[in-house]
Amino acid sequence: MHQADQDFNYWWNTSGPWVEEPNVRRSGTSGVQRVMHNGTTVYVKRQTGHLFRSLKYPFGRPTVLREGKALSKLQELGVAAPQPIFYSAKKIDGVWQGLLVTKDLNGFQDLDTWYDNGGQARLSEHEHLQLLERLATLLAKMHLGRWQHGCMRSKHVFMKERNTAAGIEVELALLDLEKSHGRATTLRAARHDIPQLRRHSYWSVAEWRTFLACYEKVLGQPLGSDVHANVQPRRRALS
């Protein structure tokens, strides 16, 4: 048996508590388990018959291969995201099985949960503006590499607080990159992700102006007046 097959079989047969229970998506199944490996926590995504289709792959290609490639590309661009340890796919009796193994982002949580749990109240106004500027810089760096997230929502941005002598600082990372792929130009990537993020985030118009000003400064070009048009912020659900 080749080493690649041995590695695939090893990861396929690991087990641990479910982080995402197996569910049916894209006419296939997908689930994620938290697994201990050599004393560290990793996340193992297993998929069966879970494919995406494109002009290049009209008959379908395992989604984990696109996501693994995206994570590797973000590493190359210096954009924080889970580090891929292993990803591969193979056909068993005519059905694709796919694997993606990533390192744990220890201490991170998604932005929506952080806001809903009162995270913003722990920051000064200046610190919160810094959070928006850090996110703007992170996304601009990805788009300058002509790469788009593809499903840009605030819940797919993960953050971690750090107490420093100067106050609270935040680290940011991007997750859920199943739809992520390269684009022909920076602007195409930007004009896909940024309006999508606007529709699926809670920030006020004023906060978005701060975000966009920083984003366009790093990007080095404007996105267009339509992106700057005021959009009603998504409302938080009442508890």
Language model: regions and residue ranges:
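N-terminal presequences and immediately downstream first alpha-helices
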Residues: 1-13
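Conserved ATP-binding subdomain of kinase catalytic cores across diverse folds
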Residues: 11-111, 140, 144-145
